[in-house]
Amino acid sequence: MGKIKKKGTSGQAKNYITRTQAVRKLQISLPDFRRLCIFKGIYPREPRNKKKASKTSTPNTTFYYTKDIQYLLHEPLLRKFREQKAVAKKIARSLGRGEVGDAARLEKNHAPKLTLDHVIKERYPTFIDALRDLDDALSLLFLFANLPSTAHVPPKTIALCQRLCHEFQHYLITTNSLRKSFLSIKGIYYQATIQGQDIMWLVPYRFVQRVNGDVDYRIMATFVDFYTTLLGFVNFRLYSSIGLRYPPKFDTRSDENGAELAAFTLEGRGVGDAPKAIEAGNTQATTSTNKEVSKEIQAKVDDVIKSAGLDEAKEEPAAETTEESSETIDKFEPAAPEADTLPQPDLSGSEAGSLFAPFTFYISREAPRAPLEFILRAFGCKRIGWDAVLGDGAFTHDETDTRITHQIVDRPQLPESSLPAIPAASKDGSDAVQKVKPGTRIPGRTYVQPQWVWDCINEGKLVRPDLYAPGATLPPHLSPWVKPSRGGYDPKASLAEQEEEGEAELDEDSDEEMEEAANDKKAEAKADVGSESEDEDESVDGGMDVAGTDDDESESEEEEEDFGGFEEEEAASESEDEEEAARTQHQKELEAEAAGLPFSSNGATSDESKKKASQAKKIAAKKRKEEEELERQKMMMSRKKRKLLEKMIYSNKKQSEEAAKLRSKRRKLEKEATK
């Protein structure tokens, strides 16, 4: 006879462990356990059967893999947590004795510091893995970079997040890796392509943030600690890959004056070359004063390069790269006209980086400077000016500068009487920057709203600026990531390109029928009101019921007895339709005669109506034929495939109906606009 298995030694009871058991096994507190799980990427699991996984009768809600907790037993961070707990006890003991100085000394000198370098290397064995997990990191760090400092969010954390985010933005500007952006209700979405990986993150708008008490900032601070370490590693690797020194030089005074991106100076590190400062936002390129290589070493290096023939080898690939860059991007077309649309390759980084290169922009005070500066620089613009109130780092603070080609304005057109007066310049010439009256238009300059910049980068080309003039109704700002599907509504395409055969004519006929029905109802209502008034005037019965004659009763009995079936009713309805058509024809003749026109001039309408009716019949016959063919094909399918086909047809029909509604709405709006 075999051994009886003990309960909880195999199966789900062995594979899963509760959170309370895990905390006891690791011998740490619950907050430290949460931090450790966040750092190591260990998350709760849901067993198939909670009853079998639980060793007790209490309804447990949080389970972990037993192997994950066993893996945490060997984590070096556990020793740091225990050291922190011991130091916290000593600090509490000193504060209890009233020894504040000793407590401050213990906190400053003996508090252990956590290092997450080994955790980053364990979780991301390759650099591509780190790039794939960068979306949430950037979104959270950009969020904390825009938060106000509170007791839960210290200023050091905010400054660290701002510095890391600006360093990452500088890499995107230098390599022209930014691809798309979208203005949404939540904030501004950005998408960049780095080493073939698409990275998307969200940046909140710069409004006054109100920190609520219902948010657990301890958990978010743990994620911030991990993500700052991760982004620091990523920035170092990215800067090293393009030959830049990391971290870049940071000007604290310029940052205090609101320079932001312009407070950083990027330096290249070349073999045998002195580092050169890369223009990051300042108008004048600052040259770095670093250690110069001695002339003797440089001469020896040049001799070695010439003797090895490396300089000639370098020239050949350069010529090849220029030839490759001159080639146009291939366009992939489907083999069949009804096949799926193939994704087309995007613009290269060099083409995207030169979109705004030949222009000089000036950002007005009411426009959002930070996102506009980042996007314009990422797409090749080197000269961006703004008002001195917005901070340092501008190409020019003078709004009347003749080199400015585009000005971004985000205020409506106001009458001159409502505009404020401009103070006169001082006589001693202290006010070097000339003030311009609000609403003034300088000749030779293009004025656009901020949406023009976003639509240009999403389209990959410069769109018409007259559609984005100040005060104009802007075109819809569409998401660049939503691609129109087959049979769906495409707001960018014209109606003629996407509407089905005869859809416009049928829509017009339905609109005309609805208008005619509304007019008929109005006419009937007026006629009813007139007949009621006539009845009131001509009533002689005095409110008494008058008995009908015998002839009337016999006529009603004959009408009830004379029922010849449904065929006679259909014939009668057809005759009534013919009489109605003749009546309308006669009415049109009378209207033409009253207008002094021959009726032949109005005959075109009847011909058009006949053509529309025949076309509608053809379309209906064609649809009926297609449906019959589809039914014949479904008969040859198996039940499983037939059910699947019916689901597909149903979903496609719903999508086409929604698209038809949107096209009809757009058709009406365009018709009203042309009136």
From Swiss-Prot:
Cellular localisation: Nucleus, Nucleolus; Nucleus, Nucleoplasm
Renumbered residue ranges of the record's region Disordered: 308-330, 474-675
Alphabetical list of PROSITE patterns matching this protein: BRCT
Biased composition (Basic and acidic residues): 308-317, 518-529, 581-591, 624-634
Record's GO cellular component terms: nucleoplasm; PeBoW complex; preribosome, large subunit precursor
An individual GO BP term: maturation of 5.8S rRNA from tricistronic rRNA transcript (SSU-rRNA, 5.8S rRNA, LSU-rRNA)
Occurrences of domain BRCT (ranges): 351-470
Coiled coil: 567-675
Keywords: Coiled coil, Nucleus, Ribosome biogenesis, rRNA processing
Biased segments, Basic residues type: 612-623
InterPro entries in alphabetical order: BRCT_dom, BRCT_dom_sf, PES
UniProt GO MF annotations: ribonucleoprotein complex binding; RNA binding
Ranges of biased composition (kind: Acidic residues): 497-517, 531-540, 548-580
Taxonomic superkingdom: Eukaryota
Record-stated family: Belongs to the pescadillo family.
HAMAP family per record: Pescadillo
PANTHER family: PESCADILLO - RELATED, PESCADILLO HOMOLOG
Subunit structure: Component of the NOP7 complex, composed of erb1, nop7 and ytm1. The complex is held together by erb1, which interacts with nop7 via its N-terminal domain and with ytm1 via a high-affinity interaction between the seven-bladed beta-propeller domains of the 2 proteins. The NOP7 complex associates with the 66S pre-ribosome.
Its biological purpose: Component of the NOP7 complex, which is required for maturation of the 25S and 5.8S ribosomal RNAs and formation of the 60S ribosome.
Protein name: Pescadillo homolog
Organism: Neosartorya fischeri (strain ATCC 1020 / DSM 3700 / CBS 544.65 / FGSC A1164 / JCM 1740 / NRRL 181 / WB 181) (Aspergillus fischerianus)
Gene: nop7
